[in-house]
Curated annotation (Swiss-Prot):
SUPFAM superfamilies to which the protein is assigned, alphabetical: Ferredoxin thioredoxin reductase (FTR), catalytic beta chain
Enzyme class: oxidoreductase
Function: Catalytic subunit of the ferredoxin-thioredoxin reductase (FTR), which catalyzes the two-electron reduction of thioredoxins by the electrons provided by reduced ferredoxin.
Protein name in UniProt: Ferredoxin-thioredoxin reductase catalytic chain, chloroplastic
Cofactor(s) for this UniProt protein: [4Fe-4S] cluster
Any one of the GO CC terms: chloroplast
Complex and partners: Heterodimer of subunit A (variable subunit) and subunit B (catalytic subunit). Heterodimeric FTR forms a complex with ferredoxin and thioredoxin.
Gene name of the encoded protein: FTRC
Species for this entry: Spinacia oleracea (Spinach)
Amino acid sequence: MKALQASIAYSFPISSPAASPRRFSRVIRAQADPSDKSMEVMRKFSEQFCRKSDTYFCVDKSVTAVVIKGLADHRDTLGAPLCPCRHYDDKEAEAKQGFWNCPCVPMRERKECHCMLFLTPDNDFAGKEQTITLDEIREVTSNM
């Protein structure tokens, strides 16, 4: 069973005194956590890519956990591991285009990871680990 998270969006009109009063309703958005399968696929992918590219996870494992969860969510919702650390006007179009799908083009070409998922050994934030467990990811992201 997937856990649901709800967020409430409020809208407040800016009106002139002559404007008639309007009713605004609350909008509640539910968001399911990524599937266990996608979480495991993205966790394994991240570990393998670290080894292959001689990069390391961030010394703060919560950064790694949040990014992997974001990639898994995009894998479920968009069908591709679109970088979760960027803003997109049209996520579906970006996922199809592929430039920002993990590993993104800047990472593949220059070893530059905007998300801080894959860090070169000389990066001040690079840890010494290339592994993370599913339990670590769940623990860090459980209240998000």
